[in-house]
């Protein structure tokens, strides 16, 4: 038998577009804002869950204003995230949104219940256990989430690609050993 290919888009809950991302698989609303043929997953840092539990505020940022967050995890991420929260409060970050972390978590769970997407994957545990840490932070996994996948973005300078990135794939296959025995 053949199984069709599948892809998955991951986004972290600090991203300014995260709430729109949550709704990509919904069956209601503006169809131009929906994406029914791709899987979605949240790449959740531990600090988000701590803020949910403590009923604290959560900030969503434009990644252009805080580009380091994407490649950080654990304490380094927490420190830089809190740094940008303070900058936002001082008016030094232009594009951000603040809301109760618990409210955002409720939205995540509501949409997950309605659509089975995005599934929740936890960034810090995945990176702590990542066997190729010398390659940098891992940003995604295979569809079953038991294998973390390393990716690197292409690099551009003045609109020209100067370095090609790396795309991760997970090829699944099966072999019926009996067919190969004599």
Spans of features found by a protein language model:
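Active-site cavity-forming subdomains of large catalytic enzyme subunits
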Residues: 1-174, 181
């Amino acid at each position: 038998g053949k199984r069709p290919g599948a892809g998955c888009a991951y986004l972290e809950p600090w991203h300014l577009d995260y709430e729109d991302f949550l709704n990509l698989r919904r069956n209601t609303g503006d169809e131009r804002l929906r994406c029914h043929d791709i899987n979605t997953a949240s790449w959740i840092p531990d600090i988000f869950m701590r803020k949910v539990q403590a009923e604290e505020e959560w900030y969503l940022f434009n990644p252009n204003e805080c580009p380091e967050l994407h490649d950080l995890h654990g304490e380094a991420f927490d420190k830089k995230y809190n740094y940008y929260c303070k900058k936002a409060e001082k008016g030094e970050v232009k594009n951000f949104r603040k809301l109760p972390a618990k409210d955002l978590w409720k939205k995540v769970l509501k949409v997950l219940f309605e659509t089975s997407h995005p599934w929740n994957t936890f960034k810090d545990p995945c990176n702590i256990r990542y066997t190729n840490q010398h390659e940098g932070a891992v940003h995604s996994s295979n569809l079953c989430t038991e294998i973390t996948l390393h990716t690197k973005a292409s690099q551009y300078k003045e609109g020209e690609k100067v370095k090609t990135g790396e795309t991760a794939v997970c090829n699944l296959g099966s072999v019926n050993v009996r067919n190969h025995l004599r």
